[in-house]
Amino acid sequence: MIIFYLSGDRVFSTDQNAINGLYNKRYFGKVVEGKLFLSLLEAAYLVERGKIEVRDGKRKLSLEEIMNLGRARDELFDAKYLVYKDLRDRGYTVKSGLKFGSHFRVYRRGMEEHSEWLVWVVPENSRLSPNDITARVRVAHGVRKNMIMAIVDEDADVTYYKVEWVKF
């Protein structure tokens, strides 16, 4: 079991097995100065699968405690987690899409140089403005990616919609 330690809104490990197995082979997290950092979404996913253990000091954190930490920082954490888990379970590599104005950037199986999709997580009952949608599609188009809206319903089901420009 690979041990990670809580550090603010993420977790880290200096274990080389973590870096080799999780980062180099499965594309989780980011390596900075010899440490592998995972987001709380990534940590929750790996804890749920029994791949890692997260500690706060010496105390082991449960999956529910990690989820609660995420919820305290992000009101969309549960919806994002459902989408993250669904995409990972389908074999995609999922990374933060923050610099592209989306929740995730998604790569086909493996990690190519450029992601193919930007994913925006939207709870089913959210009110969306046309300007929000237009802005996100423009950014995706500008960086040559496909914009995907991941709609999460009250039953925790995820439906994906591709949103794109149509030229007449």
From Swiss-Prot:
One of its GO terms (molecular function) is tRNA-intron endonuclease activity. CDD domains: tRNA-intron_lyase_C (cd22363). Keywords: Lyase, tRNA processing. Gene3D superfamilies: 3.40.1350.10, tRNA intron endonuclease, N-terminal domain. It comes from the Archaea. One of its GO terms (biological process) is tRNA splicing, via endonucleolytic cleavage and ligation. Homotetramer; although the tetramer contains four active sites, only two participate in the cleavage. Therefore, it should be considered as a dimer of dimers. This is tRNA-splicing endonuclease. It comes from Thermococcus kodakarensis (strain ATCC BAA-918 / JCM 12380 / KOD1) (Pyrococcus kodakaraensis (strain KOD1)). The gene is endA.
